[in-house]
Amino acid sequence: LNRDDDSDLHSPRYSFSEDTKCDDGWFVGTSRRTK
């Protein structure tokens, strides 16, 4: 992950409405984390 601040937002139960971290590989256009 590029930012430690966002590590909290990367929680499995947390879903993003805006997909701004597709570079991390967590968000793939669907704004949802599949890990």
Curated annotation (Swiss-Prot):
Entry GO MF terms: insulin receptor binding; protein kinase binding; signaling receptor complex adaptor activity; ubiquitin protein ligase binding
Report domain SH3 positions: 22-35
Q: What does this protein do?
A: Plays a role in tyrosine phosphorylation of CBL by linking CBL to the insulin receptor. Required for insulin-stimulated glucose transport. Involved in formation of actin stress fibers and focal adhesions.
The protein in question is named: Sorbin and SH3 domain-containing protein 1
Q: How is it modified after translation?
A: O-glycosylated.
The protein's location, in the record's own words, is: Cell junction, Adherens junction; Cell membrane; Cytoplasm, Cytoskeleton; Cell junction, Focal adhesion
Where is each SoHo domain found? 1-8
Some GO term, biological process aspect, for this entry: which one?
positive regulation of D-glucose import
Q: Which gene encodes it?
A: Sorbs1
Native organism is Rattus norvegicus
Cellular component (GO) terms are: adherens junction; cell-substrate junction; cytoskeleton; cytosol; flotillin complex; focal adhesion; insulin receptor complex; membrane
Please give the residue positions where the record annotates the modification Phosphoserine.
15
Keywords carried by this UniProt record:
Cell junction, Cell membrane, Cytoplasm, Cytoskeleton, Glycoprotein, Membrane, Nucleus, Phosphoprotein, Repeat, SH3 domain, Transport
Q: How does it assemble?
A: Interacts with the long isoform of AFDN and with VCL. AFDN and VCL bind to SORBS1 in a competitive manner and do not form a ternary complex. Interacts with ABL1, CBL, CBLB and INPPL1/SHIP2 through the third SH3 domain. Interaction with ABL1 occurs only after insulin stimulation while this has no effect on the interaction with INPPL1. Interacts with the insulin receptor but dissociates from it following insulin stimulation. Also interacts with SCA7, PTK2/FAK1 and flotillin. Interacts (via SH3 domain 2) with PXN.
